[in-house]
């Protein structure tokens, strides 16, 4: 809403070189210019909007303000201006007036509200009768107006309740009867009337315009010191915007040579992150460039990235990067890849899926010192296998025994030259010499 009001006010100030801005009406006294805005906004927003419209010509060096009423004639003139926009020539909307009860002695243009001012507050439970004044709805000039109202309120001008008269439908107000005022909360939504001091004609090229306007600050833009849409434009930052040093919220962030969002230099959260030579997300030099990555010191998607190629089989050792990974110092899925360990793998010191791959062990495998699925692979044992010291699925595979096999110390393989082979008739161990066991059984029988 503020952006819309800023654009409208800038166009008004730029549009004409006459003694009143475009679409403003000069008062009968010739001292002021008025314009009715049928936009419902809170009091403070209406006040800021009117301040952005500066006087035309070289008249009084004052900014615009919400309308200030200093006489019955001015009160009626503003009322008729607003009423002229309705079908029945009656005032339809309540409008803000430029007097805030938090500073009750002055109108917003700087003139005193009283004791020499004018007021037309109605007599109602919301605004009790003024001392010394009868409870009427007349519009007196009040040389000693003590009305200040509760804090956080401002006056609105509205038409008085029309009397019910036959033949007039109960809608007409007698000619010459002006509006009434009522103090309402400044957070309420009302239309408003702006007042600008009238000036003398000057060339259009000298008119104040968008180059010196702003919304809340004295230089153009929206909230920043030099914000806007030029060489140093932006929104909210010191020099942010969409230009040479554009950005949004950072010191020099943006989409240019050093672009970024929120970081000291371009990127997202890191010291040099971004999408450039050293871009990244969250790491010291992470990103998607020469040393890009996600979270690690050198991980990423570049010369040292760590991301498995989905087009390759999982057991191949060729990966996208030499030392890529996610989260570790040199983790990844390449020559020494891994996830979370000091060197590649998952949880172990040198675990992974390569020459010495593993999961969780000191060297590749699953739980053991040298477990894995290669020459000495295994799961859980010190050497490859599942549970035994040298179990696995290779030359010495086994499950659960000290040496490969299924439960025993030696595998059931008659071609195994190992002297502990239970099928070897020369086995000196009677417990595992099957021919000898059969002979002993026959002898006992």
From Swiss-Prot:
Biased composition (Gly residues): 210-299, 324-408
Biased composition (Polar residues): 309-321
PROSITE patterns membership: C_TYPE_LECTIN_2
Matching Pfam families: Pericardin_rpt
Composition-biased stretches (Pro residues): 414-428
Region of interest (Disordered), ranges: 118-178, 210-445
InterPro entries xrefs: C-type_lectin-like, C-type_lectin-like/link_sf, CTDL_fold, Pericardin-like_rpt, SM50_spicule_matrix
SUPFAM superfamilies linked to this entry: C-type lectin-like
Domain notes: The repetitive domain may provide a calcite binding matrix.
Protein task: Major matrix protein of the sea urchin embryo spicule. The function of the matrix proteins is to direct crystal growth in certain orientations and inhibit growth in others.
Name of the protein this chain belongs to: 50 kDa spicule matrix protein
Gene (UniProt): SM50
């Amino acid at each position: 809403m503020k952006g819309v009001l800023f654009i409208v006010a800038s166009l008004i100030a730029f549009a004409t070189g006459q003694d009143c801005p475009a679409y403003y009406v000069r008062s009968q006294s010739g001292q002021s210019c008025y314009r009715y805005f049928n936009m419902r906004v809170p009091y403070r927003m209406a006040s800021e909007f009117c301040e952005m419209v500066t006087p035309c010509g070289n008249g009084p060096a004052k900014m615009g303000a919400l309308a200030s009423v200093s006489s019955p004639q001015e009160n009626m003139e503003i009322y008729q201006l607003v009423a002229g926009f309705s079908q029945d020539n009656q005032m339809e909307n309540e409008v803000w007036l430029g007097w805030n009860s938090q500073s009750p002695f002055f109108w917003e243009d700087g003139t005193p509200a009283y004791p020499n001012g004018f007021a037309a507050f109605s007599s109602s439970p919301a605004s009790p009768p003024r001392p010394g004044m009868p409870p009427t709805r007349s519009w007196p000039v009040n040389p000693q107006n003590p009305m200040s109202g509760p804090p956080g309120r401002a006056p609105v001008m509205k038409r008085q309740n029309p009397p019910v008269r036959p033949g007039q439908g109960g809608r007409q107000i007698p000619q010459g009867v002006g509006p009434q005022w009522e103090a309402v909360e400044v957070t309420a939504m009302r239309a408003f009337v702006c007042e600008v001091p009238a000036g003398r004609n000057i060339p259009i090229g000298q008119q104040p315009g968008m180059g010196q306007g702003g919304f809340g600050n004295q230089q153009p833009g929206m909230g920043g010191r030099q914000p806007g849409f030029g060489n140093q434009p932006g929104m909210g930052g010191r020099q942010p915007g969409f230009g040479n040093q554009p950005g949004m919220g950072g010191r020099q962030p943006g989409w240019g040579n050093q672009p970024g969002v929120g970081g000291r230099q371009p990127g997202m959260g890191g010291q040099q992150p971004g999408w450039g030579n050293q871009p990244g997300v969250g790491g010291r030099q992470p990103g998607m460039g020469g040393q890009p990555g996600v979270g690690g010191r050198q991980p990423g998607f570049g010369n040292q990235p760590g991301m498995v190629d989905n087009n390759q089989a999982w057991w191949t050792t060729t990966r996208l990067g030499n030392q890529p990974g996610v989260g570790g110092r040199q983790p990844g899925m390449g020559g020494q890849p891994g996830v979370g360990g000091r060197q590649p793998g998952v949880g172990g010191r040198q675990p992974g899926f390569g020459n010495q791959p593993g999961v969780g062990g000191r060297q590749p495998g699953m739980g053991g010192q040298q477990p894995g699925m290669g020459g000495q692979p295994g799961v859980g044992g010190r050497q490859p296998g599942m549970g035994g010291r040298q179990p696995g699925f290779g030359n010495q595979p086994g499950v659960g025994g000290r040496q490969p096999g299924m439960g025993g110390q030696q595998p059931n393989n008659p071609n195994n030259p190992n002297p502990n082979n239970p099928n070897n008739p020369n086995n000196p161990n009677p417990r595992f010499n099957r021919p000898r066991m059969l002979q002993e059984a026959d002898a006992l029988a």
